[in-house]
Every structure is written in structure tokens, then in C-alpha cells.
Amino acid sequence: MASELINRRHETDQPTADAYYPKPIKPWFTVTRPMRYMLREQRLIFVLVGIAIATLVFTIFPRSTQSTPYSDPFSGYGIRPDESYVPAIQAQRKPSLEYLNRIGATGGKIPLGLKRKGLRVVVTGGAGFVGSHLVDRLMARGDTVIVVDNFFTGRKENVMHHFSNPNFEMIRHDVVEPILLEVDQIYHLACPASPVHYKFNPVKTIKTNVVGTLNMLGLAKRVGARFLLTSTSEVYGDPLQHPQVETYWGNVNPIGVRSCYDEGKRTAETLTMDYHRGANVEVRIARIFNTYGPRMCIDDGRVVSNFVAQALRKEPLTVYGDGKQTRSFQFVSDLVEGLMRLMEGEHVGPFNLGNPGEFTMLELAKVVQETIDPNANIEFRPNTEDDPHKRKPDITKAKELLGWEPKVSLRQGLPLMVKDFRQRVFGDQKEGSSAAATTTKTTSA
């Protein structure tokens, strides 16, 4: 009995086929296995060839910089480098880290062989006077630009030179209707800005300022874009403070003939700040003072374009009132530089963007006489309603926070505008005379 029990215990202790025993640990297995994998089927050769090709590619192609070389759109007008604006992207304040992360930018140097990542930018009113010059700068920087314009005051001719560029797109659209686009930045310039245009359709003007701004702010909120509103010095009305600083609230007539524009812009500023505070939309506000330059509408009623067109046509220069009203005039290139610095900077604003050089209307007329026709006559007419008596920006804030100030004086910039107007005025006249001659021949035949 005892021996039987011993034998059974002995049988129980014998290993079975299904029993699990761990394999002995091989200390170099994690190293030798990948090496055997690489050595089989000539895999190592392919890896070395790939490394060699990549090294060759990144060695041959030069390292790109963060911004593309700038080409001056005013070179055709004869501006020398010291007289024109020079882009100062490197001198601009760095955008916020949150904004850089959202648009996909990264800190540090750009790797070899890679280019700066261009932004997708929409410019409402981009076929207009200021908007088209802004588009030129953005395209030269390497961005993808979408122009949204209803061509009420804009002209296709202002942006036709970009039609063949795959990074340019133009949409005929009125901003009072919503639009959905995937963009990184929104420059909201769309609105009639001359008395002739906004008095022609005042309801349309205030709708563009209010409803159009609401739609663009809504777009910025949906897609996480940064929004820049181009407001105006008209928010100061007929100012009681001179010069005007951004903290001045203005002296505006809410029921005057200019109110559709003045109050519309004031409301647009209110909406912009409400979206910033309530919906965390990144916004910027620029208050633009009188601007002149190539591509201005010839007969838009603004004083500089009026004087230049009248002098070229040998007509009297019409001065309204006693001519002692003052204005400040900045060249369009200076304004565009200020807008871009504001958009890329860290400060909301508002910022005055204008040239603090102040001229009376009579002084401006004399400068136009000196530039075009010394024999041009000056004709006085009754002043228009609600015409501000003084207008001059205090740009201390822009100097300190944006590092911006205008570079082109009136006597430097006016000849460039005259050259553009001369081509368009006499070109139109030649076309008109040719058409008249053709009509006469057809009638006589």
C-alpha cells in the first residue's frame, strides 16, 4: 500500500506535454533581431540610399527665409527706395503664441528646403483703391488672397494683374449676405468711403457697415480667423479736440447727410469690440485718415482726387467754403504698411493711421497747382453740410506700439498719383474721341 502511494506520487510529478515552462531569457535578443531583419533582403542598402538622397536634396536647395522677397508695386511709378515704404516685417512685433499655433506657424528657423507657410487671407473690398494695394502686398509676401467685392466702387482693373496667379481668387459678392470661407485673416475694407458714393445710397452704406461687419465677424468666429476692421477718422465727426487721439469719443451729428457713414463705422467698432469681449474673437481696429494715391476713383468727390482731375482737365479747382478747413493726407503705401503691422501685431487698438502733416484746402490746391498746372484757377463754392473744420491724427500710439509712421510726404506722393490719373484721364478721353470719330464716319456713310 505504501509503495503504491509512492509510485502514484512519482507519476504525478512527471511533466506533461501541455505544461508551460518559460523560455530562458536571451539578453541580446532585442538587439540581434532588428539587425537580422535589416541585413536580410538588402534592406540596409535601401535605407542608406534613402538617407543619401535626402541629404543631397536638402544640401542642394538653399534654406528659405521666413518671408518671401518683397517687390515694390510702386516701382513703375518711379519711387526710389528711400522715398517709398519698405516692408518691415522683421521689425514688427511678434504675433501672440496662441495665434501662431492656430495658423500652424512654428517658432525657430524654417528647416532646409522648406518655405514660409503662406496664410489664407480674405480682403473685402479688395478691388477698391486701398484694398487692391493691400492685395499687392499680401501676394508679394506669398499669401493666398481671396478678394470679396461687389464692384460698387471697386474695379477689376485694379487686380487684373493677379488673375493668372493660382494663389489669387476673386469672388463677386456683397458682404451684406453671409459667406463661408476657410481663412486665417480677414481684412474688412468693404464700404463706400467717398461722399459721392455713400450719399448716393445712404441705406446701403449703413447696411454694409453694420450687417456686413456682422457677417465678417461671424465668419471670423466660426473659422477662428483674426479680424481687422478699417474704421475711419470720421468717427471723430467735427472734432472739438485737436489733434485727435484714440481716446477722444468724437462730436458726430447722428442725423446728418454724412451720418450713414460716420455712425455706421462707429457701430462697426462697437460690434467688433463686442465680439472680442464676448466671443474671444481676435480683432484689430484701424482709424484711417485721408488717403491718396494711384487707383483712386477719379470722380469720387474726395478733395485730392477732385483737385488732380480738375487740374488735368484744365478746369478750375473747386474749394468749398473759405478753404481754411484742414486735412491730413497719407500716401496709400504708408497706410497699407500700417494695416499689415496692426494685423500682425499684438494690440487690438483702435489705432490712428494717418499722416500728421496738416494742410488747409487752399494749401492743398496750391500744391496741386505747383505739381500740374501753375496757371490753374481756384473757384470758391458754398461749403457742404456737416463738413468737419479740422482733422489731424495723433499717431503716438501707432509709433510706440506698432513702430509705424508715414514715410511719403505729400509733395513726394502727389506726382505718383498724378501720373496714374494722367494715364486714365487722357486714356478715357482718347477712347471717347475715337468712339465719337467712328460714330461720325458711320453716320456720314
Curated annotation (Swiss-Prot):
Thermal effects: Optimum temperature is 50 degrees Celsius.
Membrane topology: Single-pass type II membrane protein
Lumenal compartment segments: 65-445
Transmembrane segments: 44-64
One of the GO biological process terms: UDP-D-xylose biosynthetic process
pH profile of the protein: Optimum pH is 7.0.
UniProt tissue specificity: Ubiquitous.
GO molecular function: dTDP-glucose 4,6-dehydratase activity; NAD+ binding; UDP-glucuronate decarboxylase activity
Binding site for NAD(+): 149-174, 261-265, 302
Known role: Catalyzes the NAD-dependent decarboxylation of UDP-glucuronic acid to UDP-xylose. Necessary for the biosynthesis of the core tetrasaccharide in glycosaminoglycan biosynthesis.
UniProt name for this protein: UDP-glucuronic acid decarboxylase 2
Gene of this entry: UXS2
